[in-house]
Amino acid sequence: MSTSLPEAVRLFDPNLPLAVAYSGGADSTALLLACAEKWPGQVHAFHVHHGLQAAADDFERHCQQVCQAARVPLHVRRVDARHAPGQSPEDAARRARYQAFEALALDTVGLVAIKDIALAQHADDQVETLLLALSRGAGLPGLSAMPARWVRAGLNYHRPLLQVPGSELRAWLRQRGAGWIEDPSNADSRYTRNRIRAELLPVLQAAFPQFRSTFARSAEHAAQAKGLLIELAELDLAQVGVPPQLAPLQDLSRPRQANLLRHWLHSQFAAVPSTAQLAELLDQIAACTTRGHHIRIKVATGYIERRGSGLHWYNPALSP
């Protein structure tokens, strides 16, 4: 069942003061103004200047005007969001944003002790994320889509609008005569997410009017299953050791080996192996029956190799 913006904010219970990630677009404008109405004097706006568009300075000026009118302190961080070779532009921008949020929280911590940050992704964004994951053949982590709450670098992140349709946010703003800016990149059909939004979501709306709620329910089921797999991986790691030791690892079934290795790589190194890389690694582990068997396989941005009785991951670019 979809939720209205007022109801979503009523149920939202963060620690105060609260920072809202504010781009100037409709979604973050609605979240910022609704939170500022509920907690006057307790809300701050974090704006990240990516420098990727000529209009970035205009975005910042717009945010300054809105925050001044709403009496919300605005904190701006300029970042270099250009992507490195082999890195997607979206991933580079995302990483830069989170680093900026962490820096802004540190900059303001002496004054306001901000520990909670709210992001404005809504129900349509959640559907788009799930469809993108399906198109890539993602496993449970991808099918879980976006979490409503998580902790990163000591900060509590929240997505209180995941049950609210995007159209509801714009209608709420129009009722108040509140303005926002349109990011030109949102209309760029070169991006798959934009094509999903413009072409696929209207078809889903016509065929399955409740698709936002049902897709969200599927993502929640996937998130629960993912949590169980993480618990199993932790139990197996406690027996196999960190870094993983080959002999006890080989005693596990192939699916449990894969689950353990995915969790170890992601939790320890933020490395995500491809399906092909993981399959090759599992084949090598199965074939490793002698002390002299050598393993060295490209995995994510680094390599896994056998050292003695265990497996080790390293990134040559980061090694001294």
Spans of model-derived segments:
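AMP-forming adenylation/ATP pyrophosphatase catalytic core
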Residues: 2-26, 39-44, 48-50, 79-83, ...
